[in-house]
């Protein structure tokens, strides 16, 4: 997800610190600074420009849609997209949501999409939170320290996990760390976690790799920002579960109709370093939304040239 200065709306951000007045250039620069931890892009090819999803529908059987910038801006569905999604389904297309929302339970996500007018079933939504929770099956049971907001409750969270707040003992006693949302995070807590990892390196699993997210006054710092800082300071390399990393796409692949070739699947999003890079690395085709979200109508050509992450399609709108 992303946003361009001057066209911001409130949305369900799980970030805390706000970069007042920050714009796309700030976010782009920060993503480029952590490219050494991101997947490698495919060899670039010239993208095809089209008007909207209907214009490319004949090429694909499955559409993986990011949420912000594709389905909605803030608490509003993007005009025409509810009908567009319904129309794709009527044409026999499978439509899934693939989102880095990790800070709140699946029930909150589904209620939000319902409120916006979408009719996604539970199996139609794949989140980085789901990917992380599934990934826990590969880890022995332990006492996890949680970077998450207590206000969203304990639904879906592992038994015995402890919310990390201002008590240094909780950081010392945790046997590993889960970063889900940053809305209750602070520089004081970041310093406590950094020191805890230096004193006793432990696993750091990150549900939301986003560095920033849009809010009314600028950009909020998201879990990915804090995770990369922790890695640089402590030497502990995080394990990321959301876009652009493989785990969320592996989970999405389990939901895709059996036998669907990868080149008949398209990842649609507004952000080069998450949606497009991740979809491409997973072997799917990709479509960048130019008219909403990160670019909000600005021409993405300079950014594409600057980072070498090239979508297969550039769409004016979803």
Question: Where on the chain are the PLM-derived regions?
Answer:
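Asp-based, Mg2+/Mn2+-dependent phosphohydrolase catalytic module
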Residues: 2-93, 104-126, 130-318
